[in-house]
Amino acid sequence: LVQVIPPLIGLEPDVKLIVIAIVALTTAGFLLLSYEVHGRIGATAFFALPIAYSAPFQFGFVNYCLSMALAFLAFALWIRLGKTDRTGLRLLLFVPISFLIWLAHISGWGALGLFAFAAELTRMRDAGNRWFIAIIKSGLHCMPLAIPILIMVFSRSSSGDINAEDWFNWATKYEWVITSLRDRWQGFDIASVTVLLLIIAVEIVLADLRFNAILAFAALLLGVTFLIMPRILFGSAYADMRLAPYVIAVGLLAIEIKSDVNLWLRRGLISGGLLFFSARTIATTESFRRFDIMINNELAAINSIAKGARVAALISRGCVPIWMFERRSHIPSFAL
């Protein structure tokens, strides 16, 4: 995208547009998926929306976040075509769709595979198929998503190394979960994640709420993947941590309210979701405003640099870990 759009609007506006689009696509994916499985926007969907600004996004994993946003949108389409028995059209569409998502980032493609398998296995079980038959049929239905496997097999056949390190680091995985909404204010960010986890926990014990089978199974598969995935995979660090916020998101989207439930509970969840979404949006906006001021102050030095001058930049990060992600590391690249 960065290579295609710059001649039209310039490099910096292009990057800004892409990053803004990632947030919009993620929220659209959450809402469309909720609508497809529940027949309307779920009462807890608004709790999931702030995950568009999750820790992986704040960290700068824009390719990853783009692929996950596209995966959620594609999953909603997969369910829609399955419900309307247009499996032939789905076969044709998802060969290029899966390739494009894989091209954005392998993790989004992998997540889509888990999502699609969860949907198909649930559908096969509902149709009365035994587990073994249901698993086989579900795998066959997901074959349109398998084309990137051939590319990866041939591209990595020469090296033969997946470069996977740091397995089953439970303390770190716990940290990734509680920092899923990490931004600027540690107490507020951890409290926000705690609220989301409590909502999922309450759903398990409250009789008036239940999980949608497709999304519950999708969340389970994604959660198991997060637990067994190493921290470093294919030479890329934080492979597991990036999944944590999306496991929570799918868990929230899976919650549905029984039709005969107390109206006050439904209204309470919707109101609470809107309040949570508003609070996180206000906090994120203020945090980004402060980052914008800081970055512009740093960029002011570029005007004093002569064209063609040799430039060295030092960023002091300190020895004590801080909650906020470092935003200054890439600022010197503006001098190029």
Regions found by a protein language model. Give the residues of each.
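Short acidic/glycine- and proline-prone juxtamembrane loop motifs at membrane-interface regions
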Residues: F59-L66
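Signature aromatic-anchored transmembrane alpha helix within multi-pass, membrane-resident enzymes
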Residues: L196, L253, I257-A283
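Transmembrane-helix motifs of polytopic, lipid-linked glycan transferases
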Residues: L17-V37
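Short hydrophobic alpha-helices at membrane interfaces in multi-pass membrane enzymes
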Residues: R80-F99, N129-F132
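Short periplasmic/luminal acceptor-recognition loop of GT-C membrane glycosyltransferases, typified by
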Residues: F291-M294, A301-L336
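Transmembrane-helix signature of polytopic, membrane-embedded enzymes
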Residues: F30-A52
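Transmembrane catalytic cores of multi-pass membrane glycosyltransferases
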Residues: I97-F217, L227-L243
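Specific aromatic-rich, kink-prone transmembrane helix
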Residues: G29, I51-S54, L66-K83, L93
